[in-house]
Amino acid sequence: MHTNLLLENLIQGALQEIGKLGLCSELNCQYRRTYARLKIFAEKRNIDSYSSALIRSFLEDIEQKYIAGAIGSSRRTHLRRASLLLRDYVENEAIEWKTYVVNPKPMPTSQEFLLLYSRFIDNLTFYGRSENTIQSSRNLVRQFLLFLEDNGCSTLSMVSLNMVPSFFQHLLATYNSTSIRTVASHIRSFLRFAEGGERLLPLVPSRCVRSKTIIPILSYKEHDALKSVLKTRKVPLRDKAIILLALRTGLRAVDIVGMKLEDIDWVNDTISIIQSKTGKPFKIPLTADVGNVLSSYILNERPKTENPCVFLRSLAPFRPLSGHSACYALVRKSFYQAGIRLGNERKGIHVIRHSAASRMLSKGVPVTTISSMLGHSNKTSTDIYLSTDAESMRGCAIDLAEIPMNCGGLR
C-alpha cells in the first residue's frame, strides 16, 4: 500500500498506470477530467490527502447527483469506476482493468450458513466444475440460505420440513416452472454436501417440468442472407470467424471465445478444445472457409498482444470477449446487416448453433455424431433437433388412407 497519501501525487501515479492499459486518448482524457473533479471536491472540504472516507463521500455525492437527474447512467458509471481504480491503486500500487459491481448482492449473515456456502463453492472448484455451474450454484444457494434466514433460521438444524417446499413455491413468482428443475438440482447438490442436509433432501422436488419446445432455427432464406453478408466487408473478420465457426460446428459461444491460438492445428486442419460444459476434450475439423477467415483475422485484424485467446476486444484493453453477451451483440449486428430477424425473433449464437445441428441432421449426419459436436453429455438432449427437420418428420407421419373409417372423414 502507498505510504505517501498526498492526493495530487496518487492521482498522477494512477493516471500513469491507466496510460499503460493502452486505452484510447479520449478515455484517458475522461479519467484526467474525473480526477480533476475529485480534486475540486476535496479542496472544497479542505482535504489534500487520500482517505477511504474521501472516496466514500465522493461516491455518495455521485449517487445523489444521479438520483436527482444531474448526471446520466454512463457518467455515473465512469465516475464510480475512476474512483474505485484510484482506491485499488492506493491499496495495491497497481491497476487491474476489471468489472466493478455497483450493488453487491446480499449474503447470509449466519456464520454457519456463510461457512457452509464458502465450503460448498470451494468443493465445486476443487472438483473442476465449470464456471457456469459454479456461478449458478453461488446464486441459487445464496438465495436459498437468505430465504431460510428470513424465516428465522441460522443453522440447517433449525429448518422445519415445510420451509424447503415453501422456498420453491416462493421462486415461482420469478422463475418459470422449467427453471425450477435447475434450481432443484443445485439445492440438492448443496444439501448432499452440507452436514445435516440429508434430512431435507426428500423435500426437494424430484419431478420438475422440462420444456420440450420446438427450437428456433434460421430458415433457408435467412441462412443464405447471412452467408451473403459474411462475404462482404460489412462484417469484421473477427465476427465472420465466430459466426462461421458456429455455423459449421455448432460450438457454444463460451467455447468459441475461449479458444486459444495453440488450439488450432494448421498442419492437420483441426481445432482441439476442452468443452466448457462437459469438461471433455474434443477435436473438430477446420474447414477451408473457416480457416481462411481465421488466418486473415489473426494476421491482419487481431490486436498484437501476448494474450493467448484467439478472439479479443477490438479496443484496448485487449481482453478476451465476454462469452454470450459479446457474441449476442455481434450476431445481432450481423443479422441486421443481412436484413434478417429485425423484430423480436430469437437471435444470438444459440440460434446459429440450433441451425447447424438441424442442417447436419437433414444431411444424414448420425444423431450420436451431432450430439458429440454439440457437447451434449446426455445423448437424448439432441433428440429435440428432430423437431426442426421437416423432411424427417414427414417421414414419420401416418398415412390416414391406410386407416379404416366408419364416417365420411375427420370432424
Indicate residue ranges for each PLM-predicted region:
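N-terminal core-binding DNA-recognition domain of tyrosine recombinases/integrases
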Residues: I11-E26, R32-M107, S118-I214, V229
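Catalytic-site neighborhood detector that most strongly recognizes the C-terminal catalytic loop/helix
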Residues: I217, Q275, L374-D399
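Basic, Lys/Arg- and aromatic-enriched nucleic-acid-binding interface segment
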Residues: D224-A253
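Conserved tyrosine-mediated DNA breakage-rejoining catalytic core shared by Y-recombinases
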Residues: T249, G258-N292
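Short, polar N-cap/turn motifs at the start of nucleic acid-interacting alpha helices
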Residues: I264-W266, Y336, N344-E345, V365-I384, ...
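C-terminal catalytic core of Y-nucleophile DNA break-rejoin enzymes
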Residues: T278-S295, P308-R332
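Short, basic (Lys/Arg/His-rich) helix/loop patches that form interaction surfaces
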Residues: I284, A329-S372
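C-terminal secondary-structure termini that scaffold catalytic or DNA-interacting sites
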Residues: A401-R411
